[in-house]
């Protein structure tokens, strides 16, 4: 019973920071969520980050 709060918190943390650690099955949904919420600065920072600039929401430059 105590694992439910832990899972809930982990899901919240994952949804907040999933752009920093993109997974193949979550990249597209995360990009859409970011656009719908208008968090453009976070997306731009992500695109500048060599770790997560490969997300579908970032322009592929070379």
From Swiss-Prot:
Localisation: Secreted
Signal peptide boundaries: 1-21
Residue spans crossing the bilayer: none
Keyword vocabulary terms for this entry: Disulfide bond, Secreted, Signal, Toxin
Molecular function as annotated in GO: toxin activity
Modification note: Contains 2 disulfide bonds.
Domain of life assignment: Eukaryota
UniProt GO cellular component terms: extracellular region
UniProt keyword Magnesium, yes or no: no
Propeptide: 22-40
Primary location: secreted
Tissue occurrence: Expressed by the venom duct.
Domains as described in the record: The cysteine framework is I (CC-C-C). Alpha4/4 pattern.
Family membership noted in the UniProt record: Belongs to the teretoxin A (TA) superfamily.
Protein name, UniProt field: Teretoxin Tsu1.1
Organism annotation: Terebra subulata (Chocolate spotted auger)
């Amino acid at each position: 019973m105590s694992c439910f709060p832990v899972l809930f918190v982990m899901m919240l943390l994952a949804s907040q920071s999933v752009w920093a650690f993109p997974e193949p099955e979550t990249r597209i949904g995360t990009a859409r969520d970011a656009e719908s919420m208008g968090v453009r600065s976070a997306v731009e920072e992500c695109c500048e980050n060599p770790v997560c600039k490969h997300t579908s929401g970032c322009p592929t430059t070379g």
